[in-house]
């Protein structure tokens, strides 16, 4: 965890700009577990147990409006959703009272005692209140029951029973009239139809700790509930999703990751003119293990903040939620499941409350400030804070290092670039090699004795008469021309096509149960290459029909395959430490790089820069190789390999940790190479500059085993900025979507189980979908705008290890641990 003085960067200015304590009062009785309430300009809290106090933030005299009517300590209160009239409901063991604040203020000005309307009496200990969106109904949570009270008639519309423990939170669904969601100390939530009083859905037990808070996000149609141990549970409320779980988040771990990234970035420093907090809130030498109970959840829309304040936050990634905890306030992003900002009470000497027992939050749209009402965990202090979210985010968001980075090449190759040197050297030697080749051709044209059968000297014999010359090119021409015509006539990839979910052909890649390590389509979508654990490389027709072409020669599992951009060559790397380039047409070996050339086995290998280079990773470094394939066939010296490669440059990761994945674009010119390391980082290399350009620390909770870039295809086009998106995945940590321009995670996908085996991921050619394998014998398809999966593809017989989208048609190929290949087609 960072030191308090390191929490805020020099961009934030004075700490007093972030949070101001506007009001402080001390009650004779503790209100640490009382439901507090905030409206746009009013804060409500109990004073001395039975008095309901309303403090108006716009009143310069700080006059309290005190409402009396309860004889027992107030346990809960809630504001209405309408401004005129502004209602507030309060509850105690004796009464549930509804107050009209406008009428109460008028009576106070007239010197009269304000009175409320008793909604109910002796309902029990009320822990939570919530008014409906139209202020017609109030939900009163007393014990394990929920009473739906009509505000106009004070009648009980319905009594909801089913929880096994006290109900701690309740929310009305904004888009479903009559739907109510409740959370309880029984560690589950329930969905009700409060109009009929019926139960719609009941969750299982989520945690070992009680649920304390609820929040419904209308835009993403998600439910967020918080536990006493700092766990956040997120569920989908979309129709047809059946309240499935989207993610589970540990708030403590997320805050630690947030702090670690800032420390490793090295961009955050101490502000020069800030009043720094003390390093210990409880005294010198004392250390207390505090939990992060989620006391309250409230909406936080960072889109209202000026872009200059948000820094590298994208406009699509500003829907967040405020988390009120005992130690501080946190801005949590529902898209990428990350903490965007953290405000610890102990970091501000001006704050009177360092540990909170209850809190309430409300956004003010007029000035984009946030009202926070806190009650001390120990004692009777109650404080009103005014928070500036723009200053908070600006102080903690480090300047983006990726703003100048772009996957599509945006500048010419520099003379000092390894790319320039590799191409320039090739061009300089091209003329000489052509001259030597021409000389060899001239020599080959001379009549030699051993080129034909000879009976004596051979030169005096008459030449043989050609009796019959078969047209051996008929078959190849027909097949090739048909293939080329079909390739040229293929339609563009349908951008608005449906997800390929219809099961198609399924074949076994090998006679025995053999793991499929990797799969990749050719650029024209006609062929599918598969690397197997039995040392073979197979090439299937895209329809998985016919007999596959077999490429044999490796002595280990083939863990990487790659097609060249012109589809003439295939690259394969295996556990035996060798790299082989094959002729895709004849299944012949064209280039062999032995294990003696690499310090460690090759982890990743691919063509790069439109087939100009080979890019591979071995140990802590990746190598850029220039290659030459000799296509001339010499029957005499066919045993001698004339194809060759040359090392242009090698670059190592920061810290010299072994690489686990490597990715670069080959279909168009790009200077960017992405590498993942065993230290859970993703490093960006700029080969135009020949160095590391940026490092993403703590990219996942475990090492990334695959990076997948949005490369599109030659059959469809995307916006140029879309090519800056890439996916990463790690065992047990789902899949993350990143933007190279901001070096930020834009979305986190967690709906598929991958707890022990590295499963593959893939981008669709249109860039709208991402697919991934899973251990539950299913493949999952996500839409880029949603954190939960849109389709779950069944029909597999084992763990789905690899997925690949056809670049020319809406097809998805999957590979399994037992060696099966499965096609999915669009409906």
From Swiss-Prot:
Could you list this entry's UniProt keywords, alphabetically sorted: Repeat, WD repeat
Query: Is Repeat among the key words of this record?
Result: yes
Which SMART domains does the UniProt entry name for this protein?
WD40
Q: Which SUPFAM superfamilies match?
A: Quinoprotein alcohol dehydrogenase-like
Q: Where are the WD repeats?
A: 3-57, 62-101, 112-151, 155-194, 201-237, 292-337, 344-387, 502-542, 546-584, 590-629, 646-687, 698-740, 746-784, 788-826
Q: Which Gene3D superfamilies match?
A: YVTN repeat-like/Quinoprotein amine dehydrogenase
Q: Which GO terms describe its cellular component?
A: nucleoplasm
One Pfam family matching this protein: WD40
Q: Does the keyword Cell inner membrane apply?
A: no
Going by the entry's taxonomy, the superkingdom of the source organism is recorded as Eukaryota
> Which PANTHER family does the UniProt record give?
WD REPEAT-CONTAINING PROTEIN 27
Q: What is the protein's name according to its record?
A: WD repeat-containing protein 27
């Amino acid at each position: 965890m960072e030191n308090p003085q390191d929490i805020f960067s020099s961009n934030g200015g004075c700490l007093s700009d972030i949070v101001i304590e506007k009001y402080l009062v001390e009650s004779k009785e503790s209100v640490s577990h009382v439901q507090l309430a905030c409206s746009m300009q009013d804060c409500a809290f109990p004073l001395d147990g039975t008095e309901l106090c309303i403090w108006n933030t716009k009143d310069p005299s700080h006059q309290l409006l005190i409402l009396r009517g309860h004889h027992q300590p107030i346990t809960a209160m809630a504001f209405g959703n309408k401004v005129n009239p502004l209602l507030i409901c309060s509850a105690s063991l004796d009464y549930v009272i509804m107050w009209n604040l406008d009428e109460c203020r008028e009576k106070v000005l007239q010197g009269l005692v304000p009175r409320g309307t008793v909604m109910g009496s002796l309902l029990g200990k009320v822990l939570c209140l919530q008014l409906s969106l139209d202020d017609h109904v109030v939900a009163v949570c007393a014990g394990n029951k929920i009473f739906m009270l009509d505000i106009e008639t004070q009648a009980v519309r319905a009594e909801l029973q089913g929880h096994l423990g006290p109900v701690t939170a309740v929310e009305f669904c904004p888009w479903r009239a009559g739907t109510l969601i409740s959370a309880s100390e029984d560690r589950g939530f329930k969905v009700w139809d409060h109009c009929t009083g019926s139960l719609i859905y009941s969750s299982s037990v989520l945690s070992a700790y009680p649920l304390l808070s609820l929040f419904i996000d209308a835009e993403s149609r998600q439910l967020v509930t918080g536990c006493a141990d700092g766990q956040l549970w997120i569920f989908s409320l979309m129709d047809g999703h059946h309240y499935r779980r989207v993610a589970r988040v540990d708030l403590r771990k997320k805050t630690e990751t947030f702090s670690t990234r800032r420390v490793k970035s090295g961009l955050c420093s101490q502000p020069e003119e800030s009043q720094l907090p003390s390093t210990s809130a409880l005294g010198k030498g004392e250390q207390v293990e505090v939990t992060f109970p989620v006391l309250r959840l409230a909406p936080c829309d960072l889109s209202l903040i000026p872009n200059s304040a948000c820094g590298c936050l994208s406009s699509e990634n500003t829907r967040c939620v405020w988390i009120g905890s005992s130690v501080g306030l946190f801005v949590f992003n529902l898209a990428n499941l990350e903490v965007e900002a953290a405000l610890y009470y102990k970091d501000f000497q001006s704050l009177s409350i360092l540990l909170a027992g209850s809190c309430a939050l409300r956004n003010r749209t007029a000035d984009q400030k946030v009202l926070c009402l806190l009650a001390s965990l120990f004692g009777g202090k109650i404080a009103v804070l005014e928070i500036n979210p723009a200053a908070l985010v600006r102080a903690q968001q480090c300047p983006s290092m990726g703003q100048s980075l772009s996957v599509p090449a945006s500048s010419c190759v520099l003379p000092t670039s390894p790319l320039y040197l590799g191409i320039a050297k090739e061009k300089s030697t091209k003329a000489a090699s052509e001259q030597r080749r021409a000389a060899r051709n001239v020599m080959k044209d001379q009549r030699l004795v051993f080129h034909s059968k000879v009976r004596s000297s051979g030169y005096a014999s008459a030449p043989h008469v050609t009796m019959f010359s078969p047209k051996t090119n008929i078959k190849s021409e027909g097949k090739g021309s048909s293939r080329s015509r079909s390739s040229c006539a293929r339609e563009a990839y349908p951008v608005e096509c449906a997800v390929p979910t219809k099961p198609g052909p399924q074949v076994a890649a090998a006679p025995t149960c053999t793991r499929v390590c990797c799969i990749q389509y050719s650029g024209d979508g006609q062929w599918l290459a598969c690397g197997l654990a039995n040392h073979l490389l197979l090439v299937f027709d895209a329809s998985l029909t016919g007999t596959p072409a077999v490429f044999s020669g490796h002595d280990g599992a083939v863990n990487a395959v790659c097609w060249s951009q012109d589809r003439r060559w295939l690259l394969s790397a295996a556990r035996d430490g060798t790299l082989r380039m094959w002729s895709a047409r004849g299944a012949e070996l064209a280039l062999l790089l032995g294990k003696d050339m690499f310090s460690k086995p090759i982890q990743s290998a691919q063509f790069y820069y439109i087939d100009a280079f080979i890019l591979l990773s071995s140990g802590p470094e990746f190598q850029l190789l220039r290659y030459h394939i000799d296509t001339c066939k010499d029957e005499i010296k066919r045993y001698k390999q004339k194809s060759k490669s040359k090392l242009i440059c090698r670059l190592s990761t920061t810290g010299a940790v072994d690489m686990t994945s490597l990715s670069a674009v080959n279909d168009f010119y790009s200077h960017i190479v992405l590498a993942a390391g065993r230290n859970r980082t993703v490093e960006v290399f700029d080969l135009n500059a020949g160095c590391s350009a940026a490092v993403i620390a703590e990219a996942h909770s475990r090492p990334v085993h695959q990076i997948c870039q949005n490369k599109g295809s030659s059959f469809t086009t995307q916006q140029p900025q879309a090519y800056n998106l890439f996916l990463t995945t790690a065992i047990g940590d789902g899949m993350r979507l990143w933007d190279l321009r901001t070096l930020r995670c834009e979305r986190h996908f967690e709906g598929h189980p991958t707890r022990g085996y590295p499963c593959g991921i893939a981008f669709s050619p249109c860039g709208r979908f991402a697919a991934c394998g899973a251990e539950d014998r299913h493949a999952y398809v996500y839409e880029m705008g949603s954190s939960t999966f849109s389709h779950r593809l069944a029909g597999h017989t084992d763990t789905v290890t690899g997925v690949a989208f056809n670049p020319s048609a809406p097809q998805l190929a999957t590979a399994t641990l037992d060696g099966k290949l499965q096609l999915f087609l669009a409906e």
